[in-house]
């Protein structure tokens, strides 16, 4: 049987993770380290972030953690597909590969999703469905290779400040954004984060998210993402409900991503229909 593993940046709703093993990333406030989703909840994290005590640091799971997980879940005849946050954004894939080599690299495939949050999550859910259906590891990997070219993550942070503090944008850009009340709109596709637009109001940034999702064409899956913006996320889900055929999950993103986005952010994770 093929077992599916991912990391906590995948943001898969808890009721959908039964067939997926999630390895937690680390979050560090000062000298105190937490396992994402285990030692600290999203609510606790965002409450601490709002206090201004300092930007937390994030870190990948260790290779030893992956070694333990692979050794535990992979029986004598089992194989593993381990899907992770884009390698261009994090060292998780590297740690997973080292862990796999310590167990049995021939039976474990490390898959670079080139995405994160529910962009990665949609890939994991597809892999789990295929595994339940009895597809081979090679068949599932082939499907994932095709699918990841159709995955898009769009985000509208409320401010450039947290991107500046995490080193994602320069000080001058962030200060100019604050002075002019600029709201950035960014996209993640095939591991590349790019600035798509900068608008002047929150309502314009939300409208831009909807426009960008609509421009993608027919969607097979769509999730609404947020950081401490439940009401706005619920309204956004209502506004984009016509774009996808299935119920649209509303997900508060992992602290590992929220560290860089900051509070009151909104986003979308979309999978374009394959046409097959």
Feature locations, PLM:
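Class I S-adenosyl-L-methionine
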Residues: 32-105
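Short beta-strand->loop
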Residues: 84-86, 111-114
């Amino acid at each position: 049987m093929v077992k599916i593993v991912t990391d906590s940046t995948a943001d898969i709703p808890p009721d959908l993770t039964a067939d997926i093993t999630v390895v937690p990333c680390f979050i560090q406030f000062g000298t105190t380290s937490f396992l994402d989703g285990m030692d600290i909840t999203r609510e606790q994290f965002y409450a601490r972030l709002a206090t201004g005590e300092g930007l937390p640091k994030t870190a990948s799971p260790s290779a030893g953690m992956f070694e333990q997980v692979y050794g535990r879940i992979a029986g004598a005849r089992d194989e593993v597909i381990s899907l992770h946050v884009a390698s261009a954004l994090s060292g998780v894939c590297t740690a997973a590969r080292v862990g796999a080599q310590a167990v049995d690299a021939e039976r474990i495939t490390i898959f670079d999703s080139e995405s994160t949050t529910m962009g990665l999550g949609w890939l994991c859910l597809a892999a789990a469905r295929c595994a339940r259906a009895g597809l081979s590891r090679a068949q599932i990997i082939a499907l994932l290779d095709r699918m990841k070219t159709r995955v898009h993550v769009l985000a509208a942070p409320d401010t450039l400040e947290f991107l500046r503090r995490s080193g994602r944008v320069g000080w001058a850009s962030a200060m100019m954004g604050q002075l002019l009340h600029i709201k950035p709109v960014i996209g993640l596709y095939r591991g590349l984060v790019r600035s798509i637009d900068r608008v002047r109001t929150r309502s314009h940034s939300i409208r831009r998210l909807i426009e960008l999702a609509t421009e993608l064409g027919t969607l097979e899956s769509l999730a609404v993402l947020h950081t401490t913006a439940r009401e706005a996320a619920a309204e956004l889900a209502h506004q984009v409900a016509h774009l996808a055929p299935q119920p649209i999950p509303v997900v508060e993103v992992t602290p590992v991503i929220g560290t860089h986005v900051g509070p009151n952010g909104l986003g979308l994770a979309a999978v374009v229909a394959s046409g097959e």
